[in-house]
Amino acid sequence: MTVIDDRDMMGAESSELSEAGARDYFELLKPRVMSLVVFTAFAGLVLAPGEINPILGLIAILCIAVGAGASGALNMWYDADIDAVMTRTAKRPIPSGRIAPREALAFGLTLSAFSVVILGLAVNWFSAGLLAFTIFFYAVVYTMWLKRSTPQNIVIGGAAGAFPPMLGWACVTGGVSLDSVILFLIIFLWTPAHFWALALFKMRDYGAVGIPMMPNVAGERSTKNQMIVYAVLTAAAAVAPFFTGLASAGYGIFAAVLSAIFVYCSFDVRRMPEGDEKMLPAKKMFAYSVLYLFAIFSGLLADHFAPALKAVISGVL
């Protein structure tokens, strides 16, 4: 079955909506995704060498959050046709008829411009340009092109979700470095294993709307094998901050243990029989992958603040 191309499939009801509530517009921002963006951007800002005025740092994080939300709104606007068909997304504001498509588009474009301009004026134009590119990459390159045209959609499009720590870093330094690239790679390499785990137990949904996710195109076996490869690469990237001097040996051990579990989960998915109705290993992999990424960046932050905390405790004692 192919994706419905008619942008007006919602009918007249979608274009003649009653006033939408603030909660509906907030949902357009994809708050769960935005929380991860904010957290990893904050990590990049804190881990970057140098200092930034706390007020400017707060403005930077808010602008990155708004930019992420804007790209989420644009994604929901464009994907309203397939969201209406998939059970996982059918209750989103546009397909459920709570917000008109044109209102979502205007909302996303306004927030995009606002976040980029304010970040440029308040912090620096390099980070603003990188934010603009991130929004464009997610809303246009991934959503409008890659998502519906290639099973590599998540692999390439995952770059959009990997930019936040680099954005936070750029807000402090005005540029990028090897360490910021490593932070980018942790998320970039993590994305395929994370999303393909979801795609495995949502194959029917993606197949119903014609989205060429890897399990639907290459099959379960090939997808599972590739998940192992990306899990191993993610593990290597996760321990890399220790080798570059960005983090201590304590973090290196912590990341290695978490990464070993991540890789084990990918092998557990590989052992799952094809056509398994419950797909419990894939669901566990998906759930753990979220905790894993939060834990890795939490570990980096804890490692960064550990010396200062130790000094404070020593002073008190």
From Swiss-Prot:
Keyword Repressor in annotation: no
Enzyme class: transferase
PROSITE patterns the record matches: UBIA
Record localization: Cell inner membrane
Superkingdom of this protein's organism: Bacteria
GO CC term (a single one): plasma membrane
Membrane topology label: Multi-pass membrane protein
Entry-linked CDD domains: PT_UbiA_Cox10
Reaction catalysis annotation: heme b + (2E,6E)-farnesyl diphosphate + H2O = Fe(II)-heme o + diphosphate
Swiss-Prot/TrEMBL keywords: Cell inner membrane, Cell membrane, Heme biosynthesis, Membrane, Transferase, Transmembrane, Transmembrane helix
Leftover remarks: Carbon 2 of the heme B porphyrin ring is defined according to the Fischer nomenclature.
HAMAP family found in the cross-reference section: CyoE_CtaB
UniProt similarity note: Belongs to the UbiA prenyltransferase family. Protoheme IX farnesyltransferase subfamily.
Protein's recorded name: Protoheme IX farnesyltransferase
Record organism: Agrobacterium fabrum (strain C58 / ATCC 33970)
Gene coding for it: ctaB
